[in-house]
């Protein structure tokens, strides 16, 4: 079928994948799903826009409705994974002022205490966002983490809630991506691109 017919089911499938990875279930997104999202981000274009759009809407919705804190927390997990494993364009986008300001706001101001058991879930989101901001602000750390990801690309492990607590130390296999400045130490090349914004608020 023509591209304009094929593109709709592809967009819908990608949206479902990101929604599944950032849902409200008590366990983290599994490694195979994260690896598929990383592969899709490398395709660029519409795939990239769909991934960033759903992540943005999840975070915006959780900011407006803090009881959806798991959606925000798991969106941060996905952003971290794609920073380490996804496209160079995704990294450049997340490092832009637009996205860093959103993540910094989460790291400082996200609040939610469960009224049922008085457990503070806001601190989990703040700490995860703070960790992600530190990663995104460090070019050297990003290059180092992406180098580790390349070396471990043949290993497989599910990304469980325990993995999430350890910042995820095992990665799913994926195909090689085009080299960029973020992978310069491994590949000696330059690349990257810039950035649309997070999707509209829910």
Residue ranges and their predicted role:
Residues 1-202:
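Alpha-helical scaffold domains
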